[in-house]
């Protein structure tokens, strides 16, 4: 119900503000369903926990109150972090990603708002009144089996697990350093598609449909009536031929070579006229309109038109860099050289994709660190929250590099979106642990209880997310399929990070929530008369009491 309402709101908003749909926006309904269901799962788990711990009378109402009290703040934070994960992609310079980011950001906010309003209402009307008594035979479900393996490893090899995880992350981060950006529209489709086959057939019969220009500019008037300068055009074209990646190049030199051959015979085939006067005479045989694409009216500028069929921006940019170095050597200091073209401008924007995603990732991690540090009144809380977020991302980028999957408009978004989603489980786990620490001084027992309470919804929601993203693998668009596969893998990695690594760290650190400090009820007269709490602010007194342990 919450997902259907969110989908209606989202597409209504897109139509109202005039944001167009694209191949990435088509994923939004699936994202709303799988991501929205995770909060429903955590709320249902808290509701059932409230039924188990609350009184029998008015059990449904008391369970809803319990749910609101214990999961309200964590849920607000998870909605915020998930929204930030999508919103950070607004920093991209690519309209395709910006439109998707806007739609997904609104969808996450709308889903959070609808879930907070609708879910308690539906539970009050259709929720259980009590939890059935357990049967004599206890059955282990999938979350229980996973946690039994994790708990065995945590109790016996905690240090080894941390060391192995650190080594794995270092290895995959090293692999991630080999990632590259590409903007290849043809790679958006499987190779067996008719469109790809037709494009290959056209390339076999015609020169490349893509064009860029090599422009040379001299300070001297009529510089490109000098044979030595025209020879520079010819030398550049010879290097283009040697690169063996372009279909054809045309310049003023080709026109002059053709006329020279027609006048002087095959003995001078491929040769330029030897004097400036001869060049001027040959130019008189050409209409001005025939030369507009190759030389300016004052002959200070000359162009080489290069036709090619390289659609992969990463490959083309490598050849362009090599070409620019050679051109600078050929033309010397007396001329300026430029390599320009519409597809090169698009490629430069694509290269900025890497920078934009690094900025978005850094911004999101800083925001999560600050939010969690404020929530737990300590930088340690922010650091702990980042650990299970960094591990899946490091593994994902490493796998991308190992499998030679480039950064493109689809895969570039996985990191920030996955962090925003994966951190949800961490927030619920830390919030539950923080609550249980008030009841016991045994941190290990508090961690185990928190994991037991939060593992089922966390595992179920992560697996549901993995399946939800995994459905996108069957998309006809390659970048959407890659996005789905990587996001699904990241969700599974987050189970490992949240339930194996985070509990090991939690047993060694005590956290106090800001909400607990602000909501704590204390007798000010008693505190003012306490020698131990003298010269402390009210905030410091509250935190000292909450972090203290009582031993008999």
Regions inferred by a protein language model and the residue ranges of each:
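Envelope-exposed proteins and targeting segments
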Residues: 29, 210-212, 245, 300-302
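Alpha-helical transmembrane helix bundles of large polytopic membrane transport and channel proteins
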Residues: 243-285
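Extracytoplasmic
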Residues: 1, 231-234, 278-365
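Generic non-transmembrane alpha-helical segments
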Residues: 205, 235-245, 322-334, 446, ...
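Hydrophobic, well-ordered secondary-structure elements that form the walls
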Residues: 202, 214, 240, 249, ...
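Regulatory nucleotide-sensing modules
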Residues: 528-552
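Solvent-exposed, non-transmembrane loop/terminal regulatory segments of multi-pass membrane proteins
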Residues: 150-152, 178-224, 239, 272-295, ...
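Membrane-embedded transmembrane helical bundles of large multi-pass transporters/channels
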Residues: 1-184, 311, 328-520, 524-525
